[in-house]
Design a protein with these regions (language model features):
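Residues within HEAT/ARM-like alpha-solenoid scaffolds
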Residues: 37-41, 105-108, 112, 190-197, ...
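Active-site-adjacent structural elements in folded domains
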Residues: 128, 178-188, 201-206, 232, ...
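Contiguous, well-ordered alpha-helical segments that form the cores/surfaces of helical PPI scaffolds
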Residues: 196-204, 216-227, 244-248, 277, ...
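Helix N-cap / loop-to-helix initiation motif
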Residues: 35, 212, 313-317
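N-terminal transition regions in large eukaryotic proteins
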Residues: 1-208, 223, 229, 349
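Extended, Lys/Glu/Leu-rich amphipathic alpha-helical scaffolds
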Residues: 2-3, 78, 83-84, 232, ...
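Solenoid-like repeat scaffolds
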Residues: 30-32, 326-329
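Short amphipathic alpha-helical segments embedded in low-complexity Lys/Glu-rich regions
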Residues: 43-47, 58-64, 134, 212, ...
Length: 381
């Protein structure tokens, strides 16, 4: 079958001691076979976590996983105790060396992360399930679980709006059962708890940027691919591998998340402009219709681009889109083509609809065969 032929073709590309990245990119842009952990391996190569030289893989993975364990020891274990649980610092200590002041600041970041990861990819149950490989130094101690830190300060997770002279109105976001995933017992961890830790460590290591809402949607699919690898030895280290792949990807898209870089070459405004110009060139009528309705790209494509379309399609389709996006040497040229294709495929409706219906249509992209969308995108020169 065609599928078996593609699997054999990929095996041949991955066989040499030095993988030909150009060949790999060209193969993966048509989708990576969903078996044998191929996608996890190819993404590691395409995102630059692993070098094309296979003789370096074992050592790279060992070093990176060791480094990640250090991050956990430094950033997750509560101040006042070291890895073996001995008390060394006190929360009321005001000494400049006390880690408690940072600990309390961190909690603000954690509140947002906690809220976001408890709703990850709701169309599948994966993130609510227990991982086979909980992080031992964390799962065995209740205090080290990040969501436990958040629990006492739920009030602050309310939306606080300042009105005039410091009068603060609080809209409490009430927990709805369908939204928030439950935590696991001691000794166990759900996948969403692992993702929470990855994001928290990332925020700690990147204080200039910190955590921005939406990063959870970028890390989710990467973690899913690493943690559902059929190969046990890779699945066991899904957390560390995901962290470094996510970090590599974020270094390329961080401009989308940083307001001050909006005007930069890679900033989100620039990307939306590219989409508008491409649309104008490919279908003047649609472009004109949206322009007349003053339906600007930021109403819909801001989310499309920033979150790499992770919200517009079901997870299997997102993985398929990302195969091509990660294979694209210019990285986000193809992403813009997919966004353009999505609009072109809604031509009739957009030309018929009024402003309100078009906003609704583009903000809630209708179900569509992903192969249809991709072949349209590939046809855009």
């Amino acid at each position: 079958s065609l599928y078996k032929i593609r699997v054999a073709e990929l095996e041949n590309i991955l066989e040499p001691e030095i993988v030909d990245l150009k060949l790999l990119r060209s193969f993966c842009s048509n989708g990576i076979p969903d078996c044998n952990g191929f996608r996890a391996l190819c993404w590691k190569l395409l995102l630059g976590y692993l070098s094309p030289n296979k003789s370096t893989w074992t050592e790279t993975l060992r070093k990176k996983r060791e480094l990640y364990n250090q991050f956990i020891e430094e950033m997750i274990i509560p101040p006042g105790e070291n890895a073996d649980g001995k008390c060394i610092d006190h929360p009321l200590s005001e000494g400049p060396e006390s880690s408690w002041s940072t600990f309390f600041k961190d909690n603000e970041v954690l509140l947002q992360i906690d809220k976001d990861v408890r709703r990850l990819c709701p169309d599948i149950s994966f993130f609510q399930q227990a991982t086979d490989y909980p992080c031992n130094v964390v799962s065995e101690s209740r205090e080290r679980k990040l969501h436990i830190r958040v629990a006492p300060s739920t009030l602050s997770s309310a939306n606080v709006e300042r009105k005039g002279l410091g009068v603060t109105k609080i809209n409490l976001i009430t927990k709805r059962a369908t939204e928030n995933y439950e935590a696991m017992d001691e000794g166990q961890e759900a996948h969403w708890e692992v993702v929470e830790r990855i994001l928290f460590i990332y925020a700690k290591l990147n204080p200039g940027q910190g955590y921005v809402q939406g990063m959870n949607e970028i890390v989710g699919p990467i973690y899913y691919v690493m943690a559902s690898n059929p190969c046990v030895e890779y699945r066991e280290y899904a957390e560390a591998d995901c962290f470094f792949c996510f970090t590599a990807l974020m270094s390329e898209i961080r401009d989308f998340f940083i307001k001050t870089l909006d005007e930069s070459e890679g900033g989100i405004k620039m990307m939306m402009n590219k989409l508008t110009m491409l649309l104008k060139e490919k279908d003047y009528d649609i472009w004109m219709r949206l322009k007349e309705q003053e339906l600007y790209p930021q109403y819909y494509s801001f989310r499309w681009i920033t979150l790499l379309l992770s919200q517009e399609f079901p997870l299997p389709d997102v993985l398929r889109i990302w195969d091509t996006v990660f294979s694209d040497e210019k990285r986000f040229t193809f992403l813009i083509k997919v966004c353009c294709a999505m609009i072109l495929l809604l031509r009739e409706q957009i030309l018929d609809n009024d402003f309100a219906s078009n906003v609704k249509l583009l903000q809630n992209f209708p179900p569509m065969d992903i192969n249809h969308v991709l072949s349209k995108a590939f046809s855009i020169n």
